[in-house]
Amino acid sequence: MDIKVVKGSITEVDADVIVNPANSRGLMGGGVAVVIKRLGGEEIEREAVEKAPIPVGSAVLTTAGKLKFKGVIHAPTMEEPAMPSSEEKVRKATRAALELADKECFKIVAIPGMGTGVGGVPKEVAARAMVEEIRKFEPKCLEKVILVDIDEEMVEAWEKVLGLR
């Protein structure tokens, strides 16, 4: 599977679906979620909350609202909003997002740094965990993962793990 690293906003990449590193309640009050909700609309959060609780290690698909994507995958990296995350939760969330994207037969999924914002997971740790999970994953439909973040350190961490630096 092709892995591409992009510095920029997840809302501007060319992908079929984007991933929101969520909390189990589906509330979109921090980090990447705020941007997705602000640009895509309240209906994204409403639908995520309706599908809650979303356990860490699972994921749900919602509308992308006004965004150009076919949907938003909410993959919790924490149970409650602003709760600390962990490497294991990052792994589980990444795997759950990939599984759902593949099950829905999306070709390209964009994933931001998982658990690195309010979750507090060090970027290098999250980058390694995410890339390892992506490399282990055996897709049926999914062809490409775009790792995208506005944070230069996150982008550098992915590039380092992927041997691009």
From Swiss-Prot:
SUPFAM superfamilies: Macro domain-like (SSF52949). Residues 1-165 form the Macro domain. PROSITE patterns: MACRO. It comes from the Bacteria. SMART domains: A1pp. InterPro entries: Macro_dom, Macro_dom-like. PANTHER family: GANGLIOSIDE INDUCED DIFFERENTIATION ASSOCIATED PROTEIN 2-RELATED, MACRO DOMAIN-CONTAINING PROTEIN. This is Uncharacterized protein aq_987. It comes from Aquifex aeolicus (strain VF5). The lineage of its organism: Bacteria, Pseudomonadati, Aquificota, Aquificia, Aquificales.
